[in-house]
């Protein structure tokens, strides 16, 4: 009864749910803390008693999980798979399972996922921490991951982008699980669910290839006022190594870096930033350093400062107010 998903992710180490070993406990150990209980299952009585005693919970109809592991997203994924074999995991849980390190984490931490999403052609259900949509997503956008059906990463990224959950989208792009091009090729996976304009807008932002939300803000602002001649996350080779610039104006050799405190504010980050700027300066690049706070509070100042450093042909024809730019950066006003 074991599956590759549980054993590979350490599901087998489940504590006993009572003082003695019984068939239900053995099944839970084999299946990573969750079991399917049919009407005539030999362990149905044991499951009823365990639920009544608070040692197990009914996670989904016919699916019982160890109460001590019920919050584990991997257990929820396994429960969905046991409940309906055709259900396809999508969203944050799928991205973490496929290798994405969640925002703010240093490891592939499933605890960052508070709700596991899936879709099925024939069933839909909502329980605490579980949401299964009744969607008819084309099968070509689903794949097998350790015996559990999961949506391809591009489908999950596009879903999160349409919803505005850009921290996860940026991490998937930064960690190169997806690319703007691969996301464009999957645009029809949700075209029946969301309007064409919403998907087009999400893909337009993904095309910037932002690796952080502040980078996305800056890209939206540059596009809105009409800057030209720039590219996001451009690789520059120098004698000291290769560096990736947040925004680069190749003709002027002007780069823009959005320096956040969590990375650039540490002693190691500060030293790396200084060495990086010096190396790029030796290579003929002029670097402009801004912070997310500057961009959020004074976006017009940032854009006017940048405009002074580039050729006239690449400058915007008009400039917007801070209020207008802020709404555009946050995605409240379409561009």
Feature annotation, model-predicted:
Residues 1-194, 311-335:
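Short gly/ser-rich loop at a beta-strand->alpha-helix junction or flexible surface loop bordering the NTP-binding
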